[in-house]
Curated annotation (Swiss-Prot):
Reactions this protein catalyses: RNA(n) + a ribonucleoside 5'-triphosphate = RNA(n+1) + diphosphate
Family: Belongs to the influenza viruses polymerase PB1 family.
Region (Disordered): 52-82
Region Promoter-binding site, residue ranges: 249-256
EC number: 2.7.7.48
GO MF, one example: nucleotide binding
Motif (Nuclear localization signal): 187-195, 203-216
Protein name: RNA-directed RNA polymerase catalytic subunit
């Protein structure tokens, strides 16, 4: 029998059909090659939006800088970055008037955090520009290198372990006449391989000392490295994103802490909360506007889009905001917070890897690094690239481009939200002093504007006034990309609102399926995703049950672990059948060992091992949960792990899942190819660092890693802790006399070895 698909929707309210409009199947696009072109685009565009500003030269670095602040008022609808200082300050004052004490309280909260935050806060985060090696590194390594080099240059405040003291070192480093750094370089040589007798290129890594004068050091400290943003859907062109170095990171963190504290107190802010909490907060604003628009009033909502939010923001404006917000606070606090915007006003954008040229006829490839773009003959480039390079040339110093205006992506999300909310705040009747009024929602560059007025002309006037007010602070609402609707239907940060926020379950589709970490984690993540969607995204019981069955099927095909009594033949079926036959209680076998699936929508919260534990044969239990199993390199056994799940839209989300460590929780070995490259030394450093920290935390479970003062104290601390713990355990009868004696002996041996060294 044929089913007419329209019948499926007869009883469904239209907003529930949103999940059927899902356009994103398949993998998102990734970028390949160099990001240099995209970065030049960003730099050139940013300068174009501020072109009527004043040019100055930075006295320290010699970089030309464009300052659009208090520039000409716009005469057309083109996007521009000419924010007016007095307008921004006035918006801040009104925001404080409507929320008495908000800035004062947030400052006090932040001050407390500033004094308590430890340096290891900066090890969070992914790739970081490492100024010592002039390329990206994992955050922990970049921080370690920075502290190491500071120390060898006599800057040791950070040894206290407080972030604020590390920042003191950063400030002092900028006053130094020169900094001595250690950089890596590689030598290549041709050698004959003993096994294959072929010639191979062997790379060795060397370290060398290098002196940077004040100018070169400042340029590096102010540099943001750029990369191409990956996995962006619905865009034809890629775009560049920035990773700042360690000098900037700490200062940005404190500014964002203050701004986050303010955002938490603003009902129009979509940050820093997320998920259901965010939906509830936003629904309140909509409810307020709809209840207040009595029968006589009209209410319309704009689903807003801003043109190039980051490129029209200005760090100098943020400095003005911070100066105002912290005006009654102690001097040291105001100074710490104003450094981030000052550094951003003097920032340099690193152009990335440069361009790759290849000659088809001669089979030659050559890389033109970004440093050469300043003086290379342009005849080799196509017209488009020629124009870009010509435009950017006046701004280049050492392969980096001076970029004073603009903010780069994702740097001050919270603070720019405060600016956006301050304009929404001006929509109250006591400020508009007319019949129309507005309110709305702001989350970084995304906004929704709700305007109420007695008639259509009033609505139009309200929108126009909002548009023009935004222009005064460097926010450019795009008239082409924003659309207006009767209040009750709009979109904000990929949440669709229609008489309430609609659960758009299809957005989560990419995160269903097998993650490919290992058998244990994948099972746990799979059922957790289904559970979370039942809680948060209106995934109904019947659909969830079906999703579960599809997941189990997918899982069995991925790991070739079909049930022991199946007819399907795979590489593993011989072994699994054997296990099936010799197992007494077959229900106790894990799905990954060819067992049956015992999950249903009621028990998704229980890890599979726990679900089946009572059903398992004893010898199976012993094999499954055996920490001495030689085939498993065990991860740290924690009760909760974090998985990264990819929704269709927006950033990757971190999701917790229960981790029960079994012999199925294996970790694949690292790819060996890295061991032959220049990265090898860094990799070894990093592993050593990791091992030391892990060991230290075993002794002091709650410790956050502090760099010990003087090299010996870390080991000494662990030895003395081991002795104390052993004595307590011995006296309470937890360990035997022989074990106690052995521990004491090991401790003495360690001390002896240290003395000899």
């Amino acid at each position: 029998m044929d089913v007419n698909p329209t019948l499926l929707f007869l009883k469904v309210p239209v907003q529930n059909a949103i999940s059927t409009t899902f356009p994103y199947t398949g993998d998102p696009p990734y970028s390949h090659g160099t990001g240099t072109g995209y970065t030049m685009d960003t730099v050139n565009r940013t300068h174009q939006y501020s072109e009527k500003g004043k040019w100055t030269t930075n006295t320290e670095t010699g970089a030309p800088q464009l300052n659009p602040i208090d520039g000409p008022l716009p005469e057309d609808n083109e996007p521009s970055g000419y924010a007016q200082t007095d307008c921004v300050l006035e918006a801040m004052a009104f925001l404080e008037e409507s929320h008495p004490g908000i800035f004062e309280n947030s400052c006090l909260e932040t001050m407390e955090i500033v004094q308590q935050t430890r340096v290891d806060k900066l090890t969070q985060g992914r790739q970081t520009y490492d100024w010592t090696l002039n390329r990206n590194q994992p955050a922990a390594t970049a921080l370690a290198n920075t502290i190491e080099i500071f120390r060898s240059n006599g800057l040791t405040a950070s040894e206290s372990g407080r972030l604020i003291d590390f920042l003191k070192d950063v400030m002092e480093s900028m006053d130094k006449e020169e900094m001595e750094i250690t950089t890596h370089f590689q030598r290549k040589r041709r050698v004959r391989d003993n096994m294959t007798k072929k010639m191979v290129t062997q790379r060795t890594i060397g370290k060398k000392k290098q002196r940077l004068n004040k100018k070169s050091y400042l340029i590096r400290a102010l540099t943001l490295n750029t990369m191409t943003k990956d996995a962006e859907r619905g865009k034809l062109k890629r775009r560049a994103i920035a990773t700042p170095g360690m000098q900037i990171r700490g200062f940005v963190y404190f500014v964002e802490t203050l701004a986050r504290s303010i955002c938490e107190k603003l009902e129009q802010s979509g940050l820093p909360v997320g998920g259901n909490e965010k939906k509830a907060k936003l629904a309140n604003v909509v409810r307020k506007m709809m209840t207040n628009s009595q029968d006589t009033e009209l209410s319309f909502t704009i689903t807003g889009d801003n043109t190039k939010w980051n490129e029209n923001q200005n760090p100098r404006m943020f400095l003005a905001m911070i100066t105002y917000i912290t005006r009654n606070q102690p001097e040291w606090f105001r100074n710490v917070l104003s450094i981030a915007p000052i550094m951003f006003s003097n920032k340099m954008a690193r152009l990335g890897k440069g361009y790759m040229f290849e000659s088809k006829s001669m089979k030659l490839r050559t890389q033109i690094p970004a440093e050469m773009l300043a003086n290379i003959d342009l005849k080799y480039f196509n017209e488009l690239t020629k124009k870009k390079i010509e435009k950017i040339r006046p701004l280049l110093i050492d392969g980096t481009a001076s970029l004073s205006p603009g903010m780069m992506m994702g740097m001050f999300n919270m603070l720019s939200t405060v600016l956006g909310v301050s304009i929404l705040n001006l929509g109250q009747k006591r400020y508009t002093k007319t019949t129309y009024w507005w309110d709305g929602l702001q989350s970084s560059d995304d906004f929704a504007l709700i305007v109420n007025a007695p008639n259509h002309e009033g609505i139009q006037a309200g929108v126009d006034r909002f548009y023009r007010t935004c222009k005064l602070v460097g926010i450019n609402m795009s008239k082409k990309k924003s659309y207006i609707n009767r209040t009750g239907t709009f979109e904000f940060t990929s949440f669709f609102y229609r008489y309430g926020f609609v659960a758009n379950f299809s957005m989560e589709l990419p995160s269903f399926g097998v993650s490919g970490i290992n058998e244990s984690a994948d099972m746990s993540i799979g059922v957790t995703v289904i559970k979370n969607n039942m809680i948060n995204n209106d995934l109904g019981p019947a659909t969830a049950q079906m999703a579960l069955q599809l997941f189990i099927k997918d899982y069995r095909y991925t790991y070739r672990c079909h049930r022991g009594d199946t007819q399907i033949q795979t590489r593993r079926s011989f072994e699994l059948k054997k296990l099936w036959e010799q197992t007494r209680s077959k229900a106790g076998l894990l799905v990954s060992d060819g067992g049956p699936n015992l999950y249903n929508i009621r028990n998704l919260h229980i890890p599979e091992v726990c679900l089946k534990w009572e059903l398992m044969d004893e010898d199976y239990q012993g094999r499954l949960c055996n920490p001495l199993n030689p085939f498993v390199s065990h991860k740290e056994i924690e009760s909760v792990n974090n998985a990264v799940v990819m929704p269709a839209h927006g950033p990757a989300k971190s999701m917790e899942y229960d981790a029960v460590a079994t012999t199925h929780s294996w970790i694949p070995k690292r790819n060996r190819s890295i061991l032959n490259t220049s990265q090898r030394g860094i990799l070894e450093d990093e592993q050593m660092y990791q091992k030391c920290c892990n060991l230290f935390e075993k002794f002091f479970p709650s410790s956050s890693y502090r760099r010990p003062v003087g090299i010996s104290s870390m080991v000494e601390a662990m030895v003395s802790r081991a002795r104390i713990d052993a004595r307590i355990d011995f006296e309470s009868g937890r360990i035997k006399k022989e074990e106690f004696a052995e521990i004491m002996k090991i401790c003495s041996t360690i001390e002896e070895l240290r003395r000899q060294k």
